[in-house]
């Protein structure tokens, strides 16, 4: 799911 990937990337940016 692309949403899954987006969530992962957003998490990385949050750091």
From Swiss-Prot:
This is Chitin-binding protein HM30. Induction: By ethylene. GO terms for molecular function: chitin binding. The keyword Protease does not apply. Belongs to the parathyroid hormone family. Has antifungal activity against A.alternata, A.cucumerina, A.niger, C.gossypii, F.oxysporum, F.oxysporum subsp melonis, F.moniliforme, T.cucumeris, and V.dahliae. Has no chitinase or agglutination activities. Keywords: Antimicrobial, Chitin-binding, Fungicide. GO terms for biological process: defense response to fungus; killing of cells of another organism. The keyword Signal does not apply. It comes from the Eukaryota.
């Amino acid at each position: 799911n692309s949403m899954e990937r987006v969530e992962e990337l957003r998490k990385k940016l949050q750091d």
